[in-house]
């Protein structure tokens, strides 16, 4: 991809031949985060297009499920898609936190937080299908699909975008382009935005299982020396398992005979779910922490994995991206109402200042949890079990931990005053 920028000294020349703006917002990436942003702009008066390389039926076929925080539920409700999603996903009312074979279990309950639930677990296809159906009814939003981005030229007053759609090259013009194209974002890389972080010594192995015993709408997070294991309840007495282990061990687990694998998984879940059955393949992917130096530049904004990636412990990754999408939608809507140019850095810095610091806190917290709760050094084991004991006995610490886990700390996007107050 070729990305070019014209200096501000050429603005008088560019202004004299300024093309007609086709779209106010160009979103590259039609996944959940990009779709969240588009849904959030449904009534903004802005004209939006989404560039997506995959056909919708392919995009929604991804076999993955996510923990969704209370804050994520509020954001999705405010943009109008939650009612279609919530009836098809699981609401959980308890979180059990434990350390390998240690007998103490921290049980987080709704009354610890003063809410009716603690979170949700939703499958990728259900969430994205609801968003796609919603977007199909928005006259101000269009799709370029399947299409790939070829060139981007940044001008003082607009961004020039060239795409390839079924062999044809098309060029159009927008006020801002948004990178929702994942952790290997070409838009970010070609814009010269640097990232910092590291690859962990671990990979995740993810799968869907069917359980003999009811999961009772409880989410489990169990820490082992090799890494954490999350078990998330799904409808139909199914669970999504995310098992973190060193790279070689994760690959060995993927290749292990199914019967032996299930025996090991039954042991790791403490027998609480009874006999287990695999309903999906075992998917292995590496784990990394990444934070972009900048979330914005002139006429460009990064959201979701294009801006940051975190360890899966606590299930915060997608929730961070959805908050990015909601926050950017709010910033762009308010700027539009004020008559501001939504692609200018002074507007986009409001989004960056809001989300970059909040995401850094979550990145630091997930990294701390993984490093603290992994390993079998005597001092580490003693400290983490002391921490679990404190959480068991001191209600205020449970309350604060739950505020973090449920996304209720920090500034929330306010896309619908009737919901957010």
What are the functions of these language-model segments?
Residues 22-50:
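N-terminal Rossmann-like FAD-binding beta1-loop-alpha1 element of flavoenzymes
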Residues 63-100:
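N-terminal FAD cofactor-binding segment of flavoenzymes
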Residues 4-6, 330-421:
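C-terminal helical "tail/cap" subdomain of flavin- and related membrane-associated enzymes
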Residues 251-343:
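FAD/FMN-dependent oxidoreductases across multiple families
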Residues 42-64:
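Glycine-rich FAD pyrophosphate-binding loop
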Residues 33, 56, 184:
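Conserved Rossmann-like nucleotide-cofactor binding loop
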Residues 76, 158, 166-171, 176-282, ...:
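Conserved FAD-binding catalytic core of PHBH/FMO-like flavoproteins
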Residues 18-22, 88-190, 198-203:
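Conserved N-terminal helical subregion
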């Amino acid at each position: 991809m070729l990305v070019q920028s014209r200096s501000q000294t050429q603005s008088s020349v560019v202004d004299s031949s300024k093309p007609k703006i086709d779209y106010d917002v160009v979103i590259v990436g039609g996944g959940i985060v990009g779709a969240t942003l588009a849904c959030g702009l449904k009534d903004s008066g802005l004209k939006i297009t989404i560039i997506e390389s995959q056909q919708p039926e392919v995009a929604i076929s991804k076999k993955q499920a996510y923990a969704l925080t209370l804050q994520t539920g509020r954001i999705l409700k405010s943009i109008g898609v939650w009612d279609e999603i919530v009836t098809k996903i699981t609401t959980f009312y308890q979180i059990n936190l434990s350390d390998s074979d240690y007998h103490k279990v921290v049980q987080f309950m709704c009354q610890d937080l003063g809410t009716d639930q603690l979170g949700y677990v939703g499958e990728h296809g259900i969430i994205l299908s609801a968003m796609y159906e919603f977007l199909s009814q928005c006259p101000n939003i269009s799709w370029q699909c399947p299409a790939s981005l070829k060139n981007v030229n940044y001008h003082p007053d607009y961004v020039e975008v060239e795409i390839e759609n079924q062999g044809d090259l098309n060029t159009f013009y927008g006020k801002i382009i948004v990178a929702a194209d994942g952790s290997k974002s070409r838009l970010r890389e070609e814009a010269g935005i640097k990232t910092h972080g590291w690859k962990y010594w671990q990979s995740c192995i993810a799968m869907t299982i069917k359980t003999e015993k009811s999961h009772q709408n409880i989410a489990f997070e169990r820490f082992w020396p090799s890494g954490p294991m999350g078990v998330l309840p799904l409808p139909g007495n199914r669970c999504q398992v995310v098992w973190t282990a060193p790279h070689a061990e994760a690959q060995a687990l993927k290749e292990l005979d199914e019967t032996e694998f299930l025996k090991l998984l039954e042991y790791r879940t403490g027998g609480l779910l009874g006999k287990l059955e695999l309903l999906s393949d075992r998917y292995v992917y590496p784990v990394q922490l990444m934070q972009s130096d900048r979330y914005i530049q002139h006429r460009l904004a990064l959201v979701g994995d294009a801006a940051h990636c975190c360890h899966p412990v606590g299930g915060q990754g997608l929730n961070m991206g959805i908050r990015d999408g909601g926050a950017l939608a709010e910033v762009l809507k308010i700027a539009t109402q004020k008559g501001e140019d939504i692609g200018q850095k002074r507007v986009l810095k409001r989004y960056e200042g809001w989300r970059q610091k909040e995401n850094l806190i979550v990145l630091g917290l997930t990294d701390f949890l993984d490093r603290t709760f992994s390993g079998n050094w005597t001092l580490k084991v003693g400290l983490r079990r002391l921490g679990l004991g404190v959480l068991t006995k001191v209600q205020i610490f449970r309350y604060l931990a739950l505020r973090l886990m449920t996304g209720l700390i920090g500034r929330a996007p306010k896309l619908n005053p009737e919901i957010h107050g």
